Amino acid sequence: MKIRLHTLLAVLTAAPLLLAAAGCGSKPPSGSPETGAGAGTVATTPASSPVTLAETGSTLLYPLFNLWGPAFHERYPNVTITAQGTGSGAGIAQAAAGTVNIGASDAYLSEGDMAAHKGLMNIALAISAQQVNYNLPGVSEHLKLNGKVLAAMYQGTIKTWDDPQIAALNPGVNLPGTAVVPLHRSDGSGDTFLFTQYLSKQDPEGWGKSPGFGTTVDFPAVPGALGENGNGGMVTGCAETPGCVAYIGISFLDQASQRGLGEAQLGNSSGNFLLPDAQSIQAAAAGFASKTPANQAISMIDGPAPDGYPIINYEYAIVNNRQKDAATAQTLQAFLHWAITDGNKASFLDQAHFQPLPPAVVKLSDALIATISS
Protein backbone atom coordinates (compact mmCIF):
# COMPACT_ATOMS: atom_id res chain seq x y z
CA MET A 1 0.00 0.00 0.00
CA LYS A 2 1.07 3.57 -0.56
CA ILE A 3 0.04 6.31 1.84
CA ARG A 4 1.05 9.85 0.94
CA LEU A 5 0.00 11.65 4.13
CA HIS A 6 3.45 11.32 5.63
CA THR A 7 4.98 12.64 2.41
CA LEU A 8 2.66 15.64 2.47
CA LEU A 9 3.62 16.48 6.03
CA ALA A 10 7.31 15.84 5.46
CA VAL A 11 7.40 18.54 2.80
CA LEU A 12 6.40 21.02 5.45
CA THR A 13 9.44 20.38 7.62
CA ALA A 14 11.43 22.72 5.40
CA ALA A 15 9.20 25.59 6.58
CA PRO A 16 8.00 26.70 10.03
CA LEU A 17 5.75 23.74 10.72
CA LEU A 18 3.21 24.11 13.44
CA LEU A 19 1.78 26.91 15.50
CA ALA A 20 3.85 28.87 17.98
CA ALA A 21 4.40 26.06 20.45
CA ALA A 22 4.84 23.23 17.95
CA GLY A 23 6.65 20.22 19.31
CA CYS A 24 5.64 21.11 22.87
CA GLY A 25 2.67 18.76 23.12
CA SER A 26 4.04 17.20 26.30
CA LYS A 27 4.13 20.51 28.17
CA PRO A 28 1.47 21.03 30.86
CA PRO A 29 -1.54 22.82 29.33
CA SER A 30 -1.84 26.53 30.01
CA GLY A 31 -5.47 27.24 29.21
CA SER A 32 -7.71 29.62 31.10
CA PRO A 33 -8.78 28.19 34.46
CA GLU A 34 -12.13 29.95 34.09
CA THR A 35 -13.09 27.87 31.06
CA GLY A 36 -10.98 24.80 31.52
CA ALA A 37 -9.37 25.28 28.11
CA GLY A 38 -6.52 22.80 27.94
CA ALA A 39 -7.08 21.77 31.55
CA GLY A 40 -8.91 18.48 31.04
CA THR A 41 -12.42 19.91 30.73
CA VAL A 42 -13.95 21.29 27.56
CA ALA A 43 -14.82 24.96 27.15
CA THR A 44 -18.47 25.08 26.11
CA THR A 45 -18.61 28.82 25.44
CA PRO A 46 -16.17 30.86 23.36
CA ALA A 47 -14.08 33.77 24.53
CA SER A 48 -15.95 37.07 24.86
CA SER A 49 -13.49 38.92 22.62
CA PRO A 50 -13.77 38.85 18.80
CA VAL A 51 -12.24 35.65 17.41
CA THR A 52 -11.97 34.36 13.86
CA LEU A 53 -11.41 30.64 13.29
CA ALA A 54 -10.13 29.62 9.86
CA GLU A 55 -11.04 26.23 8.36
CA THR A 56 -9.99 24.73 5.05
CA GLY A 57 -9.81 21.27 3.52
CA SER A 58 -12.25 18.50 2.66
CA THR A 59 -14.78 19.39 -0.01
CA LEU A 60 -16.90 16.54 1.35
CA LEU A 61 -17.06 18.28 4.75
CA TYR A 62 -17.30 21.79 3.28
CA PRO A 63 -21.13 21.84 2.95
CA LEU A 64 -21.45 20.97 6.63
CA PHE A 65 -19.04 23.71 7.70
CA ASN A 66 -21.12 26.10 5.61
CA LEU A 67 -24.06 25.19 7.85
CA TRP A 68 -22.14 25.10 11.12
CA GLY A 69 -20.27 28.39 10.72
CA PRO A 70 -23.29 30.69 10.32
CA ALA A 71 -25.23 28.84 13.03
CA PHE A 72 -22.40 29.23 15.54
CA HIS A 73 -21.96 32.89 14.57
CA GLU A 74 -25.68 33.51 15.10
CA ARG A 75 -25.36 32.10 18.60
CA TYR A 76 -22.06 33.86 19.32
CA PRO A 77 -21.84 37.00 17.14
CA ASN A 78 -18.26 37.73 18.24
CA VAL A 79 -17.06 34.50 16.58
CA THR A 80 -16.49 34.30 12.83
CA ILE A 81 -15.70 31.00 11.13
CA THR A 82 -14.30 31.08 7.60
CA ALA A 83 -14.55 27.91 5.53
CA GLN A 84 -12.93 26.84 2.26
CA GLY A 85 -13.18 23.61 0.29
CA THR A 86 -9.61 23.03 -0.87
CA GLY A 87 -9.30 19.25 -0.48
CA SER A 88 -8.22 17.17 2.51
CA GLY A 89 -4.57 17.27 1.51
CA ALA A 90 -4.51 21.06 1.62
CA GLY A 91 -6.43 21.06 4.89
CA ILE A 92 -3.90 18.77 6.56
CA ALA A 93 -0.97 20.77 5.19
CA GLN A 94 -2.34 24.13 6.30
CA ALA A 95 -3.28 22.86 9.76
CA ALA A 96 0.26 21.53 10.11
CA ALA A 97 1.75 24.82 8.92
CA GLY A 98 -0.40 26.79 11.34
CA THR A 99 -2.09 28.89 8.67
CA VAL A 100 -5.55 27.63 9.69
CA ASN A 101 -7.09 26.50 12.97
CA ILE A 102 -8.94 23.54 11.47
CA GLY A 103 -7.86 21.32 8.61
CA ALA A 104 -10.96 19.42 7.51
CA SER A 105 -10.16 15.92 6.29
CA ASP A 106 -11.83 12.67 5.28
CA ALA A 107 -8.48 10.98 5.95
CA TYR A 108 -6.96 10.45 9.36
CA LEU A 109 -3.36 11.07 10.32
CA SER A 110 -1.61 7.80 11.12
CA GLU A 111 0.16 7.19 14.41
CA GLY A 112 3.44 7.71 12.56
CA ASP A 113 2.29 11.07 11.19
CA MET A 114 1.25 12.24 14.64
CA ALA A 115 4.46 11.01 16.24
CA ALA A 116 6.52 12.87 13.65
CA HIS A 117 4.52 16.09 14.06
CA LYS A 118 3.76 16.56 17.72
CA GLY A 119 0.61 18.45 18.49
CA LEU A 120 -1.48 17.46 15.46
CA MET A 121 -4.65 15.55 16.33
CA ASN A 122 -7.50 13.78 14.55
CA ILE A 123 -10.83 14.90 16.02
CA ALA A 124 -13.83 13.01 14.65
CA LEU A 125 -16.77 15.32 13.86
CA ALA A 126 -19.37 13.15 12.10
CA ILE A 127 -19.77 10.01 9.99
CA SER A 128 -19.78 10.27 6.22
CA ALA A 129 -19.75 8.03 3.17
CA GLN A 130 -18.75 8.05 -0.47
CA GLN A 131 -20.87 7.20 -3.47
CA VAL A 132 -19.82 5.89 -6.87
CA ASN A 133 -21.62 7.62 -9.72
CA TYR A 134 -21.74 7.14 -13.46
CA ASN A 135 -23.05 8.81 -16.60
CA LEU A 136 -24.95 6.24 -18.64
CA PRO A 137 -27.98 7.77 -20.39
CA GLY A 138 -30.79 5.25 -20.67
CA VAL A 139 -29.65 3.10 -17.75
CA SER A 140 -32.11 3.69 -14.91
CA GLU A 141 -31.05 0.84 -12.64
CA HIS A 142 -28.67 1.25 -9.70
CA LEU A 143 -25.82 -0.78 -11.19
CA LYS A 144 -23.98 -3.20 -8.93
CA LEU A 145 -20.23 -2.66 -8.78
CA ASN A 146 -17.52 -3.93 -6.47
CA GLY A 147 -13.93 -2.99 -5.71
CA LYS A 148 -12.40 -5.53 -8.04
CA VAL A 149 -14.46 -4.40 -11.02
CA LEU A 150 -13.91 -0.72 -10.21
CA ALA A 151 -10.17 -1.35 -9.95
CA ALA A 152 -10.23 -2.90 -13.43
CA MET A 153 -12.16 0.10 -14.75
CA TYR A 154 -9.62 2.52 -13.29
CA GLN A 155 -6.73 0.38 -14.56
CA GLY A 156 -8.15 0.33 -18.08
CA THR A 157 -8.59 -3.44 -18.30
CA ILE A 158 -12.38 -3.01 -18.37
CA LYS A 159 -12.84 -0.71 -21.33
CA THR A 160 -16.60 -0.66 -22.00
CA TRP A 161 -19.71 -0.73 -19.84
CA ASP A 162 -20.96 -3.97 -21.42
CA ASP A 163 -17.84 -5.83 -20.30
CA PRO A 164 -18.65 -9.38 -19.09
CA GLN A 165 -17.40 -8.58 -15.57
CA ILE A 166 -19.92 -5.75 -15.20
CA ALA A 167 -22.64 -7.78 -16.90
CA ALA A 168 -22.09 -10.68 -14.48
CA LEU A 169 -22.92 -8.37 -11.56
CA ASN A 170 -25.99 -6.97 -13.34
CA PRO A 171 -27.95 -9.79 -15.00
CA GLY A 172 -30.88 -8.59 -17.05
CA VAL A 173 -29.61 -5.03 -17.36
CA ASN A 174 -29.16 -3.75 -20.92
CA LEU A 175 -25.65 -2.35 -20.66
CA PRO A 176 -24.40 -0.05 -23.45
CA GLY A 177 -21.08 -0.52 -25.20
CA THR A 178 -20.05 3.00 -24.14
CA ALA A 179 -16.37 3.46 -23.36
CA VAL A 180 -15.53 3.67 -19.65
CA VAL A 181 -14.07 7.05 -18.71
CA PRO A 182 -12.51 6.88 -15.22
CA LEU A 183 -12.61 10.21 -13.40
CA HIS A 184 -10.34 10.85 -10.42
CA ARG A 185 -9.44 13.74 -8.15
CA SER A 186 -6.51 15.87 -9.29
CA ASP A 187 -6.04 17.49 -5.89
CA GLY A 188 -4.85 15.80 -2.70
CA SER A 189 -8.09 14.32 -1.48
CA GLY A 190 -9.54 12.35 1.39
CA ASP A 191 -12.07 11.05 -1.12
CA THR A 192 -9.20 9.48 -3.04
CA PHE A 193 -7.91 8.08 0.27
CA LEU A 194 -11.29 6.40 0.91
CA PHE A 195 -11.93 5.15 -2.62
CA THR A 196 -8.47 3.69 -3.13
CA GLN A 197 -8.65 1.95 0.25
CA TYR A 198 -11.82 0.24 -0.96
CA LEU A 199 -10.13 -0.84 -4.19
CA SER A 200 -7.08 -2.04 -2.26
CA LYS A 201 -9.15 -4.10 0.18
CA GLN A 202 -11.26 -5.76 -2.50
CA ASP A 203 -8.42 -6.20 -5.00
CA PRO A 204 -5.41 -6.80 -2.71
CA GLU A 205 -3.28 -8.62 -5.28
CA GLY A 206 -3.92 -6.01 -7.95
CA TRP A 207 -4.72 -2.46 -6.91
CA GLY A 208 -3.59 -3.18 -3.36
CA LYS A 209 -0.03 -3.80 -4.57
CA SER A 210 0.03 -0.90 -7.00
CA PRO A 211 -0.92 1.91 -6.94
CA GLY A 212 -2.28 1.30 -3.43
CA PHE A 213 -4.06 3.99 -1.46
CA GLY A 214 -3.52 7.52 -0.21
CA THR A 215 -4.73 11.09 -0.53
CA THR A 216 -2.88 11.10 -3.86
CA VAL A 217 -1.99 8.01 -5.89
CA ASP A 218 -0.43 7.41 -9.27
CA PHE A 219 -3.60 6.56 -11.16
CA PRO A 220 -2.90 4.36 -14.19
CA ALA A 221 -2.58 6.25 -17.47
CA VAL A 222 -5.84 5.06 -19.02
CA PRO A 223 -6.62 6.62 -22.43
CA GLY A 224 -9.39 9.18 -21.98
CA ALA A 225 -9.22 9.23 -18.18
CA LEU A 226 -9.88 12.61 -16.59
CA GLY A 227 -9.03 14.46 -13.38
CA GLU A 228 -11.03 17.12 -11.54
CA ASN A 229 -10.58 19.24 -8.42
CA GLY A 230 -13.05 18.89 -5.56
CA ASN A 231 -16.33 17.04 -5.34
CA GLY A 232 -18.06 19.81 -7.24
CA GLY A 233 -15.62 19.32 -10.09
CA MET A 234 -16.22 15.57 -10.01
CA VAL A 235 -19.99 16.07 -10.33
CA THR A 236 -19.61 18.52 -13.21
CA GLY A 237 -16.93 16.51 -14.98
CA CYS A 238 -18.92 13.29 -14.81
CA ALA A 239 -22.17 14.96 -15.87
CA GLU A 240 -20.44 16.32 -18.98
CA THR A 241 -18.78 13.02 -19.93
CA PRO A 242 -20.90 10.07 -21.13
CA GLY A 243 -19.39 6.79 -19.93
CA CYS A 244 -17.85 8.43 -16.88
CA VAL A 245 -17.41 6.62 -13.56
CA ALA A 246 -16.54 8.76 -10.54
CA TYR A 247 -16.20 8.62 -6.75
CA ILE A 248 -18.03 11.50 -5.07
CA GLY A 249 -18.62 12.42 -1.43
CA ILE A 250 -22.10 11.79 -0.03
CA SER A 251 -22.61 15.50 0.75
CA PHE A 252 -22.85 16.00 -3.03
CA LEU A 253 -25.55 13.34 -3.46
CA ASP A 254 -28.24 15.90 -4.30
CA GLN A 255 -26.05 17.68 -6.87
CA ALA A 256 -25.15 14.36 -8.52
CA SER A 257 -28.81 13.38 -8.70
CA GLN A 258 -29.83 16.76 -10.10
CA ARG A 259 -27.24 16.35 -12.87
CA GLY A 260 -28.73 12.97 -13.79
CA LEU A 261 -25.86 10.77 -12.62
CA GLY A 262 -26.55 7.15 -11.75
CA GLU A 263 -25.64 5.84 -8.31
CA ALA A 264 -24.06 2.42 -7.86
CA GLN A 265 -24.84 -0.24 -5.31
CA LEU A 266 -21.44 -1.19 -3.93
CA GLY A 267 -20.42 -4.70 -2.94
CA ASN A 268 -19.30 -5.14 0.65
CA SER A 269 -17.11 -7.76 2.31
CA SER A 270 -20.11 -10.10 2.64
CA GLY A 271 -20.88 -9.88 -1.07
CA ASN A 272 -24.02 -7.80 -0.54
CA PHE A 273 -24.70 -4.72 -2.66
CA LEU A 274 -25.99 -1.56 -1.01
CA LEU A 275 -26.68 2.09 -1.63
CA PRO A 276 -25.29 4.66 0.84
CA ASP A 277 -28.38 5.46 2.89
CA ALA A 278 -28.77 6.16 6.60
CA GLN A 279 -29.45 2.52 7.43
CA SER A 280 -26.49 1.03 5.57
CA ILE A 281 -24.08 3.72 6.80
CA GLN A 282 -25.16 3.34 10.43
CA ALA A 283 -24.99 -0.46 10.16
CA ALA A 284 -21.42 -0.24 8.89
CA ALA A 285 -20.41 2.23 11.59
CA ALA A 286 -22.00 0.43 14.53
CA GLY A 287 -19.22 -2.10 14.99
CA PHE A 288 -16.45 0.51 14.99
CA ALA A 289 -17.47 2.69 17.95
CA SER A 290 -15.91 0.35 20.51
CA LYS A 291 -12.85 -0.20 18.29
CA THR A 292 -12.04 3.48 17.77
CA PRO A 293 -8.74 4.28 19.53
CA ALA A 294 -8.13 7.36 21.63
CA ASN A 295 -6.31 9.07 18.73
CA GLN A 296 -9.26 8.21 16.45
CA ALA A 297 -7.04 6.95 13.62
CA ILE A 298 -9.12 4.11 12.21
CA SER A 299 -10.25 2.89 8.81
CA MET A 300 -13.90 1.87 8.53
CA ILE A 301 -13.63 0.84 4.89
CA ASP A 302 -15.27 -2.46 3.89
CA GLY A 303 -16.08 -3.51 7.44
CA PRO A 304 -17.66 -6.81 8.53
CA ALA A 305 -21.35 -5.79 8.82
CA PRO A 306 -23.36 -7.81 6.26
CA ASP A 307 -25.82 -4.93 5.85
CA GLY A 308 -23.17 -2.21 5.99
CA TYR A 309 -22.21 0.13 3.16
CA PRO A 310 -18.51 -0.41 2.41
CA ILE A 311 -17.14 3.15 2.03
CA ILE A 312 -17.75 5.08 5.25
CA ASN A 313 -15.48 7.22 7.40
CA TYR A 314 -15.17 9.63 10.25
CA GLU A 315 -14.90 13.22 9.08
CA TYR A 316 -12.03 14.85 10.94
CA ALA A 317 -10.86 18.20 12.17
CA ILE A 318 -7.07 18.08 11.99
CA VAL A 319 -6.10 20.43 14.79
CA ASN A 320 -2.94 21.52 16.56
CA ASN A 321 -3.32 21.28 20.32
CA ARG A 322 -1.40 24.56 20.70
CA GLN A 323 -3.12 27.70 19.48
CA LYS A 324 -1.74 31.23 19.26
CA ASP A 325 -3.55 32.62 22.32
CA ALA A 326 -5.97 31.68 25.07
CA ALA A 327 -9.00 33.26 23.38
CA THR A 328 -8.43 31.25 20.20
CA ALA A 329 -7.90 28.03 22.15
CA GLN A 330 -11.07 28.54 24.19
CA THR A 331 -13.14 29.43 21.14
CA LEU A 332 -11.81 26.50 19.13
CA GLN A 333 -12.70 24.16 21.98
CA ALA A 334 -16.19 25.60 22.25
CA PHE A 335 -16.85 25.39 18.51
CA LEU A 336 -15.61 21.81 18.14
CA HIS A 337 -17.60 20.70 21.20
CA TRP A 338 -20.69 22.38 19.74
CA ALA A 339 -20.06 20.67 16.38
CA ILE A 340 -20.13 17.17 17.90
CA THR A 341 -23.17 17.89 20.09
CA ASP A 342 -25.66 20.45 18.79
CA GLY A 343 -23.98 20.39 15.38
CA ASN A 344 -24.58 16.63 15.15
CA LYS A 345 -28.34 17.08 15.20
CA ALA A 346 -30.38 15.97 12.21
CA SER A 347 -31.22 19.58 11.32
CA PHE A 348 -27.59 19.95 10.23
CA LEU A 349 -26.43 16.45 9.28
CA ASP A 350 -29.42 15.49 7.15
CA GLN A 351 -28.71 18.35 4.76
CA ALA A 352 -25.26 16.87 4.05
CA HIS A 353 -26.40 13.22 4.28
CA PHE A 354 -24.04 12.66 7.22
CA GLN A 355 -24.67 10.53 10.31
CA PRO A 356 -24.03 11.47 13.96
CA LEU A 357 -21.13 10.21 16.02
CA PRO A 358 -21.95 7.43 18.50
CA PRO A 359 -21.85 8.61 22.15
CA ALA A 360 -18.62 6.68 22.81
CA VAL A 361 -16.87 8.49 19.96
CA VAL A 362 -18.21 11.87 21.12
CA LYS A 363 -16.42 11.22 24.42
CA LEU A 364 -13.18 10.44 22.60
CA SER A 365 -13.47 13.63 20.55
CA ASP A 366 -14.21 15.70 23.64
CA ALA A 367 -11.15 14.26 25.39
CA LEU A 368 -8.96 15.48 22.52
CA ILE A 369 -10.72 18.85 22.33
CA ALA A 370 -9.99 19.36 26.03
CA THR A 371 -6.24 19.26 25.34
CA ILE A 372 -6.30 22.36 23.11
CA SER A 373 -4.50 25.25 24.79
CA SER A 374 -2.28 28.24 24.03
From Swiss-Prot:
GO terms for biological process: phosphate ion transmembrane transport. GO terms for molecular function: phosphate ion binding. A lipid is attached at C24 (S-diacylglycerol cysteine). Residues 25-48 are annotated as: Disordered. CDD domains: PBP2_phosphate_binding. Induction: By phosphate starvation (at protein level). It is found in: Cell membrane; Secreted. It comes from the Bacteria. Keywords: Cell membrane, Lipoprotein, Membrane, Palmitate, Phosphate transport, Secreted, Signal, Transport. Phosphate binds at S58, T59, L60, S88, D106, S189, G190, D191. A lipid is attached at C24 (N-palmitoyl cysteine). GO terms for cellular component: ATP-binding cassette (ABC) transporter complex; extracellular region. It is a lipid-anchor. The keyword Ubl conjugation does not apply. Residues 1-23 form the signal peptide. Its main location: membrane. Functions in inorganic phosphate uptake, a phosphate-binding protein, although probably not the main uptake protein under phosphate starvation. Part of the ABC transporter complex PstSACB involved in phosphate import. The complex is composed of two ATP-binding proteins (PstB), two transmembrane proteins (PstC and PstA) and a solute-binding protein (PstS). Belongs to the PstS family. This is Phosphate-binding protein PstS1. The gene is pstS1.
